[in-house]
Amino acid sequence: SGTTSYSKGVMLPYRSLWSNTKFAFEVLELEAGDKIVSMLPMAHMYGLAFEFLYEFSVGCHIYFLTRMPSPKIIFQAFEEVKPSLIVAVPLIIEKIIKKSVLPKLETPAMKILLKVPIINDKIKATVREEMIKAFGGNFKAVIVGGAAFNQEVEQFLKMIDFPYTVGYGMTE
């Protein structure tokens, strides 16, 4: 565990793995044959439980990244695989938004356009659709967890009505 402080080893019983898998069966809607891009370390419970155990038990196809997950590599994988579920840590989502999306919206012209009600809605809808497409365009959910989420990025996702869920670690 180390979501909000220094890392520390935590012993987790079998029932914690089972309860997370059972929870995923109850709330996630994956089916056999759905595709997942696994980018989180399997040595961490978040990645193991929500990018492998649940998907494996459902019968999903799990694609493991063979390199460190940079935004470029992740988007390339999303484009090729078109995952049904995206499980990420906040840092990945934050890098993508801060480097690829926010700079375009912070230009002087865009700041003015975002103040005009009807145009504002169109811009937000366009940004949301572009982000959905960049994430493969096929996902049923984006789950963000394993660390604290940057408030600016979370507010942005809420503003554009991007479909995501924030999870919280079972060892906290």
Where are these regions (language model features)?
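Active-site proximal helix/loop that lines the substrate pocket
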Residues: 2-5, 44, 172
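GHKL-family ATP-binding catalytic core of two-component histidine kinases
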Residues: 11-13, 89, 150
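Short gly/Ser/Thr-rich phosphate-binding loop of adenylate-forming enzymes
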Residues: 114-162
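Conserved AMP-binding/adenylation subdomain of ANL enzymes
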Residues: 18-35, 42-130, 163
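Transmitter module of two-component histidine kinases
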Residues: 6-10, 36, 46
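Conserved AMP-binding A3 loop
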Residues: 1-19
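Short, surface-exposed connector motifs at secondary-structure boundaries
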Residues: 4-6, 33-35, 59, 133-140
